[in-house]
Curated annotation (Swiss-Prot):
Positions bound to ATP: 168-170, 228-233, 259-262
InterPro entries: PfkB_dom (IPR011611), Ribokinase-like (IPR029056)
Top-level EC class as recorded in UniProt: transferase
Keywords, in A-Z order: ATP-binding, Carbohydrate metabolism, Kinase, Nucleotide-binding, Transferase
Organism superkingdom: Bacteria
Gene Ontology MF, one: ATP binding
Annotated family: Belongs to the carbohydrate kinase PfkB family.
Entry EC no(s): 2.7.1.45
Catalytic site: 262
Residues given in the record as substrate binding sites: 30-34, 88, 102-104, 170, 262
Organism per entry: Pseudoalteromonas atlantica (strain T6c / ATCC BAA-1087)
Function noted in UniProt: Involved in the degradation of 3,6-anhydro-L-galactose, which is the major monomeric sugar of red macroalgae. Catalyzes the fifth step of the pathway, the phosphorylation of 2-keto-3-deoxygluconate (KDG) to 2-keto-3-deoxy-6-phosphogluconate (KDPG).
Catalytic activity: 2-dehydro-3-deoxy-D-gluconate + ATP = 2-dehydro-3-deoxy-6-phospho-D-gluconate + ADP + H(+)
Name assigned to this protein: 2-dehydro-3-deoxygluconokinase
Length: 318
């Protein structure tokens, strides 16, 4: 019996941050990539792939090695001859909120659709049980390539893949709200699982409540709608019908919120791929996000996360 397959689409970048000793350090991160790492950590039997563009620079070589260390295949890391990987610097304020500076314009990942066409590789891809992308996956592309990505995902869905999408709205990536809404709607149209935050919908569409988000999403063929509502908790809907509400549990401390949503998405999707109920999947995903915000950086140290996962498993069994 084959392992379930999970492919995430997007951009992994070099992450620069300053240590407590005022020294510069680097790692690798990106929203859908982070989610994929946490999915693999939660459900080790997953075969995980990351579809993106990389360069021929030294950071690209180190980056794909980083993927492999985390159990992520680099089989679909498509190499550009003249573009390198993107870079971002992160600074956290006293509340753990993050502030970014980016150097990603025309990075290799922004050329993804051209790289797919040039390599003529799509026809050789295996079946993917789950395809995951985000508003950022779309936002880095030209409009022509956004359309090509939506068409690619439509083809994968037609072959039996389930599609998951997180809006992850970043205003600076879009010409204006109308531009972002156009592509949000295109993404919702092809998605089976949607993981919006209330802030996404409020900022883009003016939705002031979870019920407004649910009513809006009823025009799409969304099977699972998981609305992250901050301190109000998480609300789950199955084919438009209310399923459950998981209350918000604050973390003991909040050091870095960089990957809270990414870890939530990864663990939730991994649980669902392991046939766990939506409510339990949300509980585990929320707990994982609560752990991640207590540590610096997008990817929590493996031993810390594994110990947390084991404690949670023991508690669940008990």
């Amino acid at each position: 019996m084959r392992n379930p397959t999970f492919i995430a689409i997007g951009e992994c970048m070099v992450e620069l941050s300053v240590t407590a000793q005022n020294k510069l350090q680097h790692s690798y991160a990106g929203d859908t990539y982070n989610s994929l790492v946490y999915a693999k950590r939660w459900h080790n039997e997953l075969d995980c792939y990351f579809l993106s563009g990389i360069g021929q620079d030294s950071f690209s070589t180190l980056m794909t090695a980083h993927w492999q260390q985390h159990g992520i295949s680099d089989e679909f890391a498509l190499t550009s001859d003249d573009h390198n990987v993107g870079i971002y610097a992160i600074k956290n304020d006293d509340s753990g909120e993050r502030h970014f500076d980016y150097w990603r314009k025309e990075s290799a990942a922004t050329q993804l659709m051209s790289l797919i066409e040039q390599s003529d590789c799509e026809s050789h891809w295996p079946h993917f049980d789950l395809v995951y992308f985000s508003g950022i996956s779309l936002g880095i592309l030209s409009d022509e390539d956004k359309d090509k990505l939506i068409n690619l995902i439509t083809r994968l869905k037609a072959k039996g893949s389930k599609v998951a999408f997180d809006p992850n709205y970043r205003p600076k990536m879009w010409a204006n709200k109308a531009h972002a809404i156009r592509w949000l709607e295109a993404a919702y149209t092809v998605s089976d699982i949607v993981l919006p935050g209330t802030e996404d919908h409020h900022d883009l569409l003016g939705h002031a409540s979870v019920s407004e988000i649910v009513n809006y999403c009823k025009q799409y063929d969304v099977q699972e709608l998981v609305v992250k509502a901050g301190k109000e908790g998480v609300f789950a809907f199955d084919c438009g019908q209310a399923l459950c509400h998981v209350p918000f549990t604050p973390a003991d401390r909040q050091l870095d919120t960089t990957a809270a949503g990414d870890s939530f998405a990864g663990v939730y999707l991994a649980c669902r791929m392991a046939d766990k109920p939506m409510k339990l999947s949300i509980e585990h995903a929320s707990a994982a996000a609560g752990l991640v915000v207590q540590h610096q950086g997008a990817i929590v140290e493996h031993t810390i996360f594994d110990a947390f996962r084991q404690r949670l498993a023991n508690h669940t069994v008990a």
